[in-house]
């Protein structure tokens, strides 16, 4: 005796979504455009996809979504050097990831499937092949692991034609289950099925409400991480350096983001670069220059001798110079002074130590992006003063006004940029974030034997327990 054939609709029958169906397509397109380094084109591409889908629907034609998307990308010159197969493979990985995380089993139908005895198939009006549905059902541990889609046959349930294409349904008792009164009830009945209607309950789409300051800060960090990733793709850089201190926390969260999104960026690597303004400023040393190459720093922080010495962590070694000379102009006008000569030699030696350290870690082995909390990006300026540097861009949480003569090129920020639009809260805001996002391993002040030398802040160490609790909460 032939077994009964049981067929099931997939969407809103076997599987339900936590979101609107269009959302999975929109989000997947965003990740695909990010993969291509064109995230700014996301909205335009989404509109074109929806318009083309509408055209297919009006013509009563079926399609594969990946072919439709690749066609739009080619037509709009958005492939960015990637071949069709690479983009299709990336799309399939992204879309499966999104649907896997946005769907859940319909308990009512799963119980029904478990009690049905016979051959079981899914029949879906959908724009992928059946292997995609099989993979998704397998992930959700649904026992219906074979079936067909409208895209594969070029006809749909809504028109009734898809049922006619399935030989197994002929000459057998057939029971179909679904939620759509036209496609799953009327058309299935017309094709000879007994039918079971699954009434879909309208589910309210929950909007995320921020409950506390930790969640507010978490969204800031998440947006910063996404900003870094977007910059990496735009600049075609797979190496990302996070500066010490706040960078330790930023890297931890960026790595977490990479682990929670589609695995389409396997070439991206992240490292902590032990660096600081004090450790890097000597890179600008130029003995033939009037101010030894440090005019930018002097413009920012003043011409006091003690301030100048602090640039290089040499204030204790050369404290005598603070009383001997009125300011840096006075100091550098006496270069024949043995102590001033010794100071200049100390700065030159520090430059060599910093350069040797960067060479030892192969800092310039490939194009890179650097990440820091902000202020004005002076560490980036110091690093980029080297002839053969490979830094392509600097990503910052926020940027203050650049001083006259300071470069604003290759720098961008995610929260604010006072060079474009002034925000009154920024000084307090960044200072607060600098405290909350800080690391407790001390500030790098020099390099000894190609290893960073650090200066500990005992006040920070005393508050370390509170800081760790806050960072874990974020």
Predicted feature descriptions by range:
Residues 167, 201-224:
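Flexible inter-domain linker/hinge segments
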Residues 7, 125, 237-244, 368-371:
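Short glycine-rich phosphate-binding loop at a beta-alpha junction
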Residues 162, 180-195, 380:
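Acidic, divalent-metal-coordinating active-site segment for phosphoryl/phosphodiester hydrolysis
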Residues 84-138, 147-151:
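Substrate-recognition element of Asp-dependent hydrolases with the DxDx(T/V) motif
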Residues 213, 217, 224, 282-297, ...:
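Long, contiguous domain-sized segments
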Residues 2-48:
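Active-site neighborhood of HAD-like aspartate-dependent phosphohydrolases
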């Amino acid at each position: 005796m032939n077994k009964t054939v049981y067929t099931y609709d997939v969407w809103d029958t076997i599987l339900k979504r936590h979101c609107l169906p269009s959302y999975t397509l929109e989000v997947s397109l965003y990740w695909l455009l990010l993969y291509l380094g064109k995230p700014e084109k996301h909205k335009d591409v989404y509109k074109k996809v929806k318009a083309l889908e509408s055209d297919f629907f009006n013509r009563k034609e079926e399609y594969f979504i990946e072919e439709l998307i690749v066609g739009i990308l080619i037509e709009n010159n958005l492939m960015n050097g990637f071949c069709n197969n690479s983009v299709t493979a990336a799309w399939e990985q992204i879309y499966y990831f999104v649907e896997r995380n946005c769907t859940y089993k319909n308990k009512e139908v799963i119980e029904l499937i478990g009690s049905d005895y016979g051959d079981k198939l899914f029949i879906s009006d959908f724009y992928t092949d059946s292997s995609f549905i099989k993979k998704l059902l397998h992930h959700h541990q649904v026992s219906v692991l074979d079936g067909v889609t409208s895209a594969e046959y070029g006809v749909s349930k809504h028109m009734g034609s898809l049922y006619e294409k399935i030989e197994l349904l002929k000459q057998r008792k057939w029971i179909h289950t679904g939620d759509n009164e036209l496609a799953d009830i009327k058309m299935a009945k017309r094709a000879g099925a007994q039918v079971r209607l699954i009434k879909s309950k309208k589910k309210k789409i929950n909007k995320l409400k921020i409950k506390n300051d930790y969640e507010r800060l978490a969204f800031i960090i998440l947006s910063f991480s996404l900003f870094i990733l977007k910059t990496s793709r735009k600049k075609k850089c797979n190496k990302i350096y996070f500066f010490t201190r706040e960078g330790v926390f930023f890297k931890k969260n960026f790595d977490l983001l990479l682990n929670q999104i589609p695995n389409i960026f396997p070439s991206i690597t992240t490292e902590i670069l032990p660096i600081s303004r004090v450790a890097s400023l000597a890179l600008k040393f130029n003995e033939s220059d009037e101010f030894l190459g440090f005019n930018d720093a002097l413009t920012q922080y003043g011409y006091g001798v003690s301030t100048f010495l602090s640039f290089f962590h040499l204030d204790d070694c050369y404290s005598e110079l603070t009383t001997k000379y009125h300011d840096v102009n006075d100091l550098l006008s006496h270069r024949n002074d043995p102590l001033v000569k010794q100071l200049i030699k100390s700065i030159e030696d520090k430059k060599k130590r910093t350069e040797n350290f960067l060479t030892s870690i192969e800092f310039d082995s490939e194009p890179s992006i650097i990440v820091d909390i902000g202020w004005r990006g002076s560490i980036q300026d110091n690093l980029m003063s080297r002839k053969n540097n490979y830094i392509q861009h600097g990503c910052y949480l926020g940027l203050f006004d650049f001083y006259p003569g300071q470069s604003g090129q290759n720098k961008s920020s995610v929260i604010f940029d006072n060079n474009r639009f002034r925000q009154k809260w920024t000084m307090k805001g960044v200072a607060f974030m600098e405290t909350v996002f800080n690391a407790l391993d001390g500030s790098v002040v020099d390099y000894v034997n190609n290893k960073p030398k650090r200066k500990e802040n005992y006040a920070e160490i005393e508050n370390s327990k509170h800081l760790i609790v806050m960072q874990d909460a974020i």
